[in-house]
Amino acid sequence: MTEANSNRNRSKHARSHYGREELRTVRSVKRRTGGKNNYSKFTPMDNNESIVEESEDEGEEEDDEQEDPQPSSMAYDALLTLLDDESDHEQFHAEKEKALKKLEEEQEREEEELQEEDEDEDEEDEEINLEDFESDDESHDDPFHFHFNEEESIDRMINEYESSGLKVKMDRKVNHNGYNILEYLPSTSRCLNEVKTLDKLRIKKKLRDQFSSLDFKDELDKKLTLDIFNYKNINYQYYTRETDYQSLYLLHALNHLLKTRDRIFDHNNKISADPNLEFKDQGYTRPKILILLPTRNFCFNLMNKLIKLADIKTVENKKRFNTQFYSDFKIETLNGNKPKDFNEFFRGNSSDFFTLGVKFTRKSMKIYSMLKQSDIIFASPLGLKMLLDKEKNDYLSSIEVTILDKADGLLMQNWDHVKQIFTKSLIQAPKNFEELNCDFSRIRMWCINDQAKYVHQVLSFSKYTTPELNNIVKAPNLQGYALYKPIIDDTNNVMNQLNYQLFQSRIINKNIRLNHMFMRFPSSSPMESPKKRLNFFTKVILPNVLTKSPYTSGTLVYISSYLDYIQVKKHLSESRSEFLAVDEYTSLSASSKNRSLFEKGKYPIMLYTERMHFYKRYNLNGVRNVVFYNLPTDPDFYAQVVRQIVRNKLKDEELDLNLCSIKVMFDRFDTLKLEKIVGLKRASLLVNAEQEVFEFK
């Protein structure tokens, strides 16, 4: 919804609330040119856009009793039907664009009905007395203070950091409870202060009981908490570890918002007593926290956790939120054989289209606040990206903490949306200063000088990591960044766990084994890797599978990159090879037909994309050999695909597992993926050894 300029009276009120009423000349402004945002270095992914659902992302407050079904949900159902019934790619894309356009038109109509702006109704809530806030002493041992408010110290560090070419150094490597933690700091002579113990963290009084109730299981939990509250960038792989990291970052976000609010109100009172005082305590816009999530169900669960931690009795629009984000649908009721991670991801409302503002006032929490007036923005990358493309708004210009949760799910959707949000909108200088409703005299200097990237915190939480997730936390935060890597050894890697389970099930034994063959191809750079990979597949793997394998039919080729999939498909077509292919854009009827032909052995090869596996988890019949063209992004996919051979053995007793083969293609840039599958030590051996073929039985 395009934000109209507020009238002068309301602008004056907003400035008096968040800053001084009069607009004064800003002194000592050092706007820097150049200094391109480092987010532009992110590597794009090749994933494709998912089906979207209606969202009332900036709708204003309405009566909770009025909860009629939304027409766009019917459009979404129609769109899903199209996904099942389309006959080819062109028809699918045409129908998808038509449905998306319909969603946008319906959303615009809904927004027009909900344009009763809430500035006036919130004025009473925003007028706060001295008793309503807790003043903080600006202590040098408060991470919030020294990370955002010590402007002279911050400015010196930024100058030194930029002079070094934004170089970082490894500060230390620590081991806690099965995790290696790699900590990096800017290459500067001095660093910002850092709190070393939990009892020294300055938690707002309102949140201390919630913080004290957290279950810190071990030193790893304590270390993660300290890094979050010290404003470090973090890439945390929870992998198989059960921990309530969400409560940590939500309390951190609430603590940050309360400190920001109380500091501004404290300064307002001081200015009222002495109008000559000046304070720098704001950004261009109000939103301070951005949380990106893959589905509405994850957003629903997180919002309820936030409500509980905030301990606020009045939550406006909660019933409406429940209607639009909650569903009791359990996908496991359709097919109980799906893996646990599949059921968790697609449970409930799995729509990946939403943008939602949350605003805290004196006595309440408001869901569906206007984005420009929100404190926290919850969004899916697709929903936020489409809204930003439509509105060209600046409400992300002053975000101070960005959180990517279930980031592995974001990778499986369309990582390019995340990349564009970071490079084009997040902490970017406003495009239209005339539309800003702020007191420029109180905007922090690092914000005015386009240096927000040096204090902006990025937190990423995912099952596993990838170069994309590592890159996103390597942004130039003055506090540095920390990579949390689970230690994968010979006992807990995916391949050994799979073999142990098969041995316990008496499917394999000393005489019957599955042959895992890892084959390294030469590659000098990540840019060169796709070309070298295709060449290795066509010259080495394919001839071996077609002519030398004991089973010349039933070969499943698993491809994690869609671009690689297109190249392989093109090569096989041009060489007139007999093959089948199923991908995320294959119609339901074509997919069923191809899988049936493959099961009957009519075609020797079937190409199978990772995103197809992520969204469907098919049980494929007729699989005798597997070729991993790329290593799976999710390590569990390796075991799930290999089990396709085992399933067919259980159905066909004549199938000899000793004659089945599993071939894995990799190069020296696949270390992150290799670690989870074969373990850290073996991964290092596979990448660095002189020999290029490794066989595991």
From Swiss-Prot:
Cell compartments where the protein resides: Nucleus, Nucleolus
Chief place where the protein resides: nucleus
Bias-annotated ranges (Acidic residues): 51-68, 105-128
GO molecular function: rRNA binding; U3 snoRNA binding
Keyword hit for rRNA processing: yes
InterPro entries: P-loop_NTPase, UTP25, UTP25_C, UTP25_NTPase-like
UniProt family annotation: Belongs to the UTP25 family.
Subunit structure: Component of the ribosomal small subunit (SSU) processome composed of at least 40 protein subunits and snoRNA U3.
Protein name: U3 small nucleolar RNA-associated protein 25
